[in-house]
Amino acid sequence: MSERNQRKVYVGRVVSDKMDKTITVLVETYKKHPLYGKRVKYSKKYKAHDENNIAKVGDIVKIMETRPLSATKRFRLVEIVEKAVIV
């Protein structure tokens, strides 16, 4: 049997944890403008599976691509890189 394909891994910030076992992660990347060459900030939200509800709003997390878990969930939480600072 062959190994699994390389899966996408993103690092982003949790913007919502209101759903049970699901977090919304905002991933920011930069793309180069095709004509002018300037780097433009680009962001996208992904829903990720958080089995134990450990991630909270503001945490920096790492998510990995997985099989479809629902109509919109295609990622799962790998680790919490940095906990949010509560002021």
Swiss-Prot record:
A Pfam family matched in the record: Ribosomal_S17
PROSITE patterns reported in the protein's UniProt record: RIBOSOMAL_S17
SUPFAM superfamilies in UniProt: Nucleic acid-binding proteins
GO biological process: translation
Matching InterPro entries: NA-bd_OB-fold, Ribosomal_uS17, Ribosomal_uS17_bact/chlr, Ribosomal_uS17_CS
MF term (GO), any: structural constituent of ribosome
Top-level lineage group: Bacteria
Keyword Cell membrane: no
Positions in coiled-coil regions: none
Any single GO CC term annotated in Swiss-Prot or TrEMBL for this entry: cytosolic small ribosomal subunit
UniProt entry keywords in alphabetical sequence: Ribonucleoprotein, Ribosomal protein, RNA-binding, rRNA-binding
Function recorded in the entry: One of the primary rRNA binding proteins, it binds specifically to the 5'-end of 16S ribosomal RNA.
Similarity comment: Belongs to the universal ribosomal protein uS17 family.
Alphabetized PANTHER family for the sequence: 40S RIBOSOMAL PROTEIN S11 FAMILY MEMBER (PTHR10744), SMALL RIBOSOMAL SUBUNIT PROTEIN US17M (PTHR10744:SF1)
Subunit structure: Part of the 30S ribosomal subunit.
Protein name: Small ribosomal subunit protein uS17
Name of the gene encoding the protein in the UniProt record: rpsQ
